[in-house]
Regions:
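Nucleic-acid modification enzymes, centered on SAM-dependent nucleic-acid methyltransferases
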Residues: 1-203, 212, 216-237
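Hydrophobic beta-strand segment of the Class I
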Residues: 207-208
Length: 237
């Protein structure tokens, strides 16, 4: 929570703005529902007190995140620590509070999968590789930009629910030689030259020869998220 600079009401900030290497943020972003004040504003003493209180237990939160991935194995410690270090301590606190709550609940498989989907979205949004002002493309490197935004994960929960419940057209996919009945994707497990002969006389709108590879940041984070959600052993399968 933060306070509106205009009316003084306690509201939720959509994010806090940081400079890499600094111990405290320099700004906050919000849309006040009471007086409609919005945009960037300077940080307040009250905001600083809240952050400093959480920073006192930062080592504990990072150790918990690390042990969830490594267990007793220290072989990959340096790589895992580098990935965890791109998360602000407040994000780690929220993520592991929610995961601990979920582990203590009796849930059906379907409900557990839905909660895990929301958590994945929060893990995606909660790291500090999002530059400010925000860029259109997903970050490609596992590094903190000079200016970055720490997103409010409590507000991101609402966005995650909207994302996962959005109605999108279903894309049919098949494996060669079975073709989609309408518009769709057919996977051909072979070489392009063989496909050219096999598909002679057929109408194919587009051919994708090389699948895009996940960038370094996303690939590393996927491994981290899987370990956090399901444990190191299951994540490695």
């Amino acid at each position: 929570a933060t306070r509106c600079a205009s009316c003084g009401a306690e509201i939720q900030a959509s994010g806090f703005l940081w400079t890499r290497g600094e111990k405290l943020p320099h700004g906050r972003i919000y849309d006040c529902p009471h007086c409609s004040d919005s945009g960037e504003h300077a940080i307040t003493d009250e905001d600083i007190q809240r952050i400093e209180q959480l920073q006192r237990s930062e080592l504990m939160h990072r150790s918990r995140a690390l042990s969830k991935v490594l267990g007793g194995n220290i072989a990959d410690r340096e790589t895992v620590e580098a990935a965890i270090n791109i998360y602000p301590v407040r994000s780690l606190y929220v993520l592991f509070t929610l995961m601990n709550k979920m582990e203590g609940m009796t849930l059906s498989d379907q409900r557990r999968e839905l909660l895990e989907a929301i958590l994945l979205s929060l893990m995606y949004s909660g790291n500090a590789i999002w530059s400010w002002p925000e860029e259109r493309e997903r970050p490609r490197l596992l590094s903190i930009p000079t200016q970055y935004i720490e997103k409010n994960l409590w507000l991101e929960i609402d966005q995650a629910i909207r994302t996962w419940t959005a109605e999108v057209p279903r894309v049919e996919y098949t494996t060669w030689p079975t073709m989609p009945t309408k518009n769709g994707v057919c996977l051909y497990p072979g070489r392009m030259r063989d496909l050219a002969q096999a598909a002679e006389g057929m109408r194919i709108d587009q051919v994708l020869c090389v699948f895009p590879r996940p960038n370094q940041a996303f690939w590393t984070l996927c491994s981290l998220w899987a370990s956090w959600l399901w444990g190191r052993e299951k994540a490695g399968k």
